[in-house]
């Protein structure tokens, strides 16, 4: 018996070692599979990393090339800008130096001429003193006096010409300064617009750069997600295939174990009792009933013998040692199979749980992928909607731009048509802009300013023509000694505005350009002011109503006692009102070129001559010489000339209607009326 027990134990140890070796082999195969999977993952990850590094290197090289190009462009732009600025500054400095040298030369020339004139004046004064010492005959003295006066007049004329030339140069300098100011303003505007556009371009570049960075990052993230998703799919497919094979193997093993378990159950079930055994039991029972009892030892032996017989009958083996060994071997095998079945059941449950988790993970991954796709579709739809909205808005803006452009072109054509219909002076525009067939957008204000000036001139002429009849009627009443209070009063014509002689391109800050209502209101205010002035003149002239001569002399004294007033002129009250309103100065901004003569008033002043036609008024268009009259040089020279002429023996200073009668004077109302028509014709022809 002890030997049988040791043999059974060795067999059980061999079975456990075989089981452990099987477990080790299975674990080794599992670890090898896991190692292969990890090796595949490592290769995929290394490949992905290499691709990402290559992409980043390519992007770095491209950005380096872009940076090099931008640096080259920036250096070129800076050099060009500097050269342009230097060339512009050199040109402006050269032009200014040339202007300075020319003006200095002209100033020196004028100073030399003034010195020469001073020397001649001193010589003539010394000659006059010498002639006065040498008492000659009255005829010689008169002849010398006439010669000296002629010489003085010629010198004064030369001085006036030089001063006019100097004034012309000053006016040209002023116009050039204004042009430079306008060009400087345009340059500043252009630089501001250029700076704004550069800022917008920089902002757009920054936004494009940010969008590129975000798009590249989103692309890399998308590629990474795609790679990970592909790896997960491959891994899931491999694991699913592996799990399916393992499940099939386990299912086969489970079916085999179930069959074995069923077989063992059937084998261990209750059997039918043997008839011999039943007879022996009945015989034993009869013997016990009869009282034939055996000892316990005998009973135990008999029991063992019966059991051994049963086992020998069941197994067909009569050797008890072999029976024990077979029994132990069967028990160990059953125990090992029981343990194996328990382990397989536990591992099957674990695998089923893992399969369930993997299925849930796959379902959640598919759901998240569907959600992500739905979100991407929604974002794509929103972006498409925004793009459509932006396109529609851009089309609307383009249509509005074309509409406004058409309106602007129509406005420019209408302005040009109005410019030609109004017969505006286009010499200033040709001088500034050159002869062009089309109008630029920035030239509209210049055309409108010239049209407005022409409109003011036409309104002035219209008011003058409307009030001419009333003025002649009032002059006739004053000559006849009557007053115009019983008659309806007419509004005096408006005086021309101060900006008629403004240079081209001049633009006032507050009230320029005026609208139609503002222009009418300003004209009405000027008429009201002139009306008050005329009434004040009439009030001052009422005490001296004794004769028409005293009336005309009192009205002529209002013109700061100028001897150039023509006797019997119908326009005496008109010119006196204008001169009084301007403070006694007949400037070119408030009085046009009023000529009471033929050619003696070439400088624009008010002069009278013996051969002039009294009452003839000529309004000339303002030019550069009339604009220069506002500087004070020409006016002073003309005033001095007219004053000297009034003192001379041959001058005709009219003190009233009765002075220096001749063919040129017509002191009657009829003559004044007749010459008023010539005045209106001359004014219309000049305009």
Swiss-Prot record:
Polar residues bias spans: 557-611, 620-629
UniProt superkingdom: Eukaryota
Subcellular location: Cytoplasm, Cytoskeleton, Cilium axoneme
Entries under InterPro entries matching the protein: ODA-DC/CCD, ODAD1_CC
Extent of Low complexity compositional bias: 544-556, 660-680
Chain segments carrying region Disordered: 126-147, 363-388, 487-511, 540-687
Free-text function comment from the UniProt entry: Component of the outer dynein arm-docking complex (ODA-DC) that mediates outer dynein arms (ODA) binding onto the doublet microtubule. Involved in mediating assembly of both ODAs and their axonemal docking complex onto ciliary microtubules.
Family statement drawn from the similarity comment of this UniProt entry: Belongs to the ODA1/DCC2 family.
GO BP annotations, alphabetical order: cilium movement; outer dynein arm assembly
This protein's name: Outer dynein arm-docking complex subunit 1
Gene Ontology annotations for the cellular component aspect, listed alphabetically: axoneme; outer dynein arm docking complex
Phylogenetic lineage: Eukaryota, Metazoa, Chordata, Craniata, Vertebrata
Any Pfam family hit: ODAD1_CC
Basic and acidic residues bias spans: 366-388
Keyword Coiled coil (UniProt): yes
Subunit structure and binding partners: Component of the outer dynein arm-docking complex along with ODAD2, ODAD3, ODAD4 and CLXN. Interacts with ODAD3. Interacts with ODAD4; this interaction may facilitate the recruitment and/or attachment of outer dynein arm docking complex proteins, including ODAD1, ODAD3, and ODAD4 to ciliary axonemes. Interacts with DNAH9. Interacts with MNS1. Interacts with PIERCE1 and PIERCE2; the interactions link the outer dynein arms docking complex (ODA-DC) to the internal microtubule inner proteins (MIP) in cilium axoneme.
Tissue expr: Expressed in trachea multiciliated cells.
Keywords tagged on the record: Cell projection, Cilium, Coiled coil, Cytoplasm, Cytoskeleton, Phosphoprotein
Stretches of the chain forming a coiled coil according to its record: 100-193, 222-267, 341-421
């Amino acid at each position: 018996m002890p030997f049988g027990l040791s043999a059974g134990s060795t067999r059980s140890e061999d079975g456990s070692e075989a089981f452990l070796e099987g477990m080790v082999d299975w674990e080794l195969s599992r670890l090898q599979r896991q190692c292969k999977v990890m090796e595949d993952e490592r290769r995929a990850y290394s490949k992905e990393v290499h691709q990402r590094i290559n992409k980043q290197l390519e992007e770095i090289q491209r950005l380096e090339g872009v940076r090099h190009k931008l640096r080259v462009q920036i250096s070129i732009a800076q050099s060009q800008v500097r050269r342009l600025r230097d060339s512009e500054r050199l040109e402006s400095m050269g032009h200014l130096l040339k202007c300075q040298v020319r003006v200095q030369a002209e100033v020196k020339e004028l100073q030399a001429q003034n010195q020469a004139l001073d020397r001649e004046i001193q010589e003539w004064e010394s000659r006059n003193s010498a002639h006065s010492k040498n008492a000659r005959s009255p005829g010689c003295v008169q002849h010398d006096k006439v010669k000296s006066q002629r010489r003085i007049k010629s010198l004064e004329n030369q001085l006036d010409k030089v001063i006019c030339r100097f004034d012309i140069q000053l006016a040209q300098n002023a116009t050039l300064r204004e042009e430079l100011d306008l060009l400087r303003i345009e340059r500043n505007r252009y630089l501001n617009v250029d700076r704004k556009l550069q800022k917008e371009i920089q902002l757009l570049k920054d936004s494009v750069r940010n969008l590129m960075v975000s798009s590249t990052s989103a692309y890399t993230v998308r590629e990474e997600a795609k790679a990970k998703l592909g790896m997960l799919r491959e891994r899931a497919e491999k694991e699913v295939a592996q799990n399916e094979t393992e499940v099939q193997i386990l299912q086969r093993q489970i079916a085999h174990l179930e069959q074995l378990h069923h077989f063992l159950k059937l084998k261990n079930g209750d059997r039918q009792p043997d008839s011999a055994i039943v007879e022996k039991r009945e015989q034993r029972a009869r013997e016990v009933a009869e009282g034939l009892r055996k000892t316990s030892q005998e009973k135990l032996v008999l029991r063992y013998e019966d059991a051994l017989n049963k086992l020998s009958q069941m197994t067909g083996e009569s050797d008890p040692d072999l029976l024990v060994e077979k029994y132990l071997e069967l028990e160990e095998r059953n125990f090992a199979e029981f343990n194996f079945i328990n382990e397989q059941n536990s591992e099957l449950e674990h695998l089923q749980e893992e399969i369930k988790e993997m299925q849930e993970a796959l379902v959640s991954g598919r759901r998240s992928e569907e959600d992500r796709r739905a979100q991407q579709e929604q974002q794509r739809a929103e972006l498409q909607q925004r793009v459509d909205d932006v396109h529609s808005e851009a089309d609307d803006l383009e249509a509005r731009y074309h509409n406004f452009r058409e309106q602007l072109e129509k406005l420019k054509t209408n302005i040009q048509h109005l410019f030609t219909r109004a017969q505006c002076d286009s010499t200033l525009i040709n001088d500034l802009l050159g002869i062009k067939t089309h109008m630029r957008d920035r030239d509209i204000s210049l055309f409108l300013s010239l049209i407005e000036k022409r409109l003011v001139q036409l309104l002035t002429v219209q008011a003058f023509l409307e009030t001419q009849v009333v003025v002649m009627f009032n002059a006739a009443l004053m000559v006849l000694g009557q007053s115009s209070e019983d008659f309806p009063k007419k509004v005096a014509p408006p005086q021309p505005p101060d900006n008629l002689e403004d240079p081209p391109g001049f633009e006032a800050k507050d009230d320029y350009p005026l609208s139609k209502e503002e222009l009418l209101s300003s004209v009405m205010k000027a008429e009201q002011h002139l009306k008050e002035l005329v009434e004040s003149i009439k009030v001052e002239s009422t005490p001296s109503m004794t004769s028409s001569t005293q009336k005309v002399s009192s009205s002529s004294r209002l013109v700061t006692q100028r001897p150039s007033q023509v006797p019997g002129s119908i326009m005496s009250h008109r010119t006196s009102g204008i001169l009084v309103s301007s403070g006694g100065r007949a400037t070119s901004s408030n009085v046009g070129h009023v000529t009471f003569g033929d050619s003696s008033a070439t400088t624009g002043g008010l002069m009278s001559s013996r051969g002039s036609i009294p009452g003839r008024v000529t309004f000339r268009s303002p030019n550069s010489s009339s604009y220069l009259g506002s500087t004070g040089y020409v006016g002073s020279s003309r005033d001095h000339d007219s004053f000297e002429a009034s003192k001379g023996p041959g001058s005709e200073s009219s003190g009233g209607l009765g002075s220096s009668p001749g063919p040129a004077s017509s002191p009657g109302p009829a003559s004044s009326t007749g010459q008023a028509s010539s005045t209106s014709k001359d004014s219309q022809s000049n305009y």
